[in-house]
Amino acid sequence: MKIIPLKAAHGDALIIQFSSRNKDYTIVVDGGPPETAEYVANLYDKLGYIDLLILTHYDNDHIAGILEFFSQHKHDTSEYVGQVWVNGAQLIYYDDEVNTAAYEDAFNLTVCLKHLKDHGFICQWRDGITCDMNPIIKDDFRIDILSPSTEILRTLEKSLNIMWMNMVCRMIQMLMKRYRLLMP
């Protein structure tokens, strides 16, 4: 297992690569802040096929590199990303009254996701991934979702408040053979 924390200034961006019995996997978590977005997006570009891209939450220091990566591929039609996990994306809408950077980034990400899914660049976009689900077991590894709960997502749905948007933050535990990785 190879875990590559990217130099993303004060933000988060992580690449996890490993081999199971049946295939090699690449998982990407978050994309770092605007000042490293191009650097992170270019690294993601060199990975080849990405099996799973996880966005933990919508803060700018987690989302900018992913926005840049998706923007670079807005016209691509070949599948490059197997699954994208983003909670609450269907709840984001653009509102001139609430024109904060976080809302704008989240709205732009949602537009990108819809476009890339429609054009085949992303195979599957999963929303509503919660700790209430069974572990995800594939080949010889397992992913446990530790948060958020369904209750937190329902509260987000009702409030549409920027503070609640960040409570969709996903905590994941990944288990593989003798490795255990806890990711925010």
What are these regions (language model features)?
Residues 1, 73-184:
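Flexible, acidic/histidine-containing loops and adjacent segments that form or flank the divalent-metal
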Residues 15-16, 63-67, 95-98:
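A short acidic (Asp/Glu
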Residues 17-20, 69-72, 152-153:
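Short regulatory "switch" loops immediately downstream of catalytic or recognition motifs
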Residues 1-48:
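Conserved beta-strand hairpin/beta-sheet module of binuclear metal-dependent hydrolase folds
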Residues 24-25, 34-86:
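Active-site metal-binding motif and surrounding structural segment of the metallo-beta-lactamase
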Residues 10, 33-35, 58-64, 91-94, ...:
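Active-site environment of divalent metal-dependent phosphoester hydrolases
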Residues 21-24, 50-58, 105-117:
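A generic short-segment signal for beta-strand/edge and adjacent turn/coil regions
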Residues 25-34, 56, 159-169:
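A signal for specific C-terminal beta-sheet/loop modules enriched in small/flexible residues
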